[in-house]
Design a protein with these regions (language model features):
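Conserved ABC transporter NBD signature motif
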Residues: 63-75
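A short, flexible loop at the N-terminus of ABC-type nucleotide-binding domains that lies
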Residues: 1-4, 9-26, 58-63, 79-81, ...
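Short helical segment in ABC ATPase nucleotide-binding domains corresponding to the A-loop/adjacent helical element
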Residues: 55, 90, 97, 103-114, ...
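Short, conserved post-Walker A segment of ABC-type ATPase nucleotide-binding domains
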Residues: 37, 48-61
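The feature captures the beta-strand-to-loop junction immediately N-terminal to the Walker
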Residues: 40-45
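Conserved ABC ATPase signature
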Residues: 143-146
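Conserved ABC ATPase "signature" region
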Residues: 121-140
Length: 146
């Protein structure tokens, strides 16, 4: 279950003396478990900002001001770390070339495991298991855009 109540987000100004940028204004909705939902709208409508709020990236890792409530399966996303939220919530960038963190397939698989504090030797083994599971053995060092 996803609950959003009166959610607003304002990005910090991009330049000194600039004005904050409103991205979301008073958004409210509920999504029942098992639902399949698409978010559509023109460029700049706040679709990505909304998805980042659902994943807890906003307000935890972005500069700006959030008001309202975002809960995913009873977890208030503004009161939990991104690491804790990542155990239950995933987020995929619109543009894979603008990915936030990882340079290789190996790094992409390792990232959430590292955030959960899993030992490097276990991560190394898990990468091989996951690549084998999806038929990508031998792609460990490949960069996602190649």
């Amino acid at each position: 279950m996803i609950t959003v109540r009166d959610l607003s987000w304002q990005y910090e100004p991009l330049v000194d003396g600039g004005k904050p940028v409103d991205s979301l204004k008073h958004v409210s909705f509920d999504i029942k478990s098992g639902s399949f939902v698409g978010v559509i709208g023109p460029t700049g409508a706040g679709k990505s900002t909304l998805c980042m709020a659902l994943a807890g990236i906003i307000p935890n890792l972005a500069d700006g001001t959030m008001t309202g409530l975002v809960e995913v399966n009873g977890m208030n996303t503004s009161r939990h770390s991104v690491s804790a939220l990542s155990e239950r919530i995933g987020y995929v960038q619109q543009d894979p070339e603008a990915q936030l963190f990882c340079a290789s397939v190996e790094d992409e698989i390792a990232f959430p495991l590292e955030n959960r504090g899993i030992a490097p030797d276990i991560i190394d083994k898990q990468i091989d298991v996951m690549l084998d599971l999806v038929g990508m053995t031998g792609s460990r060092k490949r960069v996602p855009t190649s």
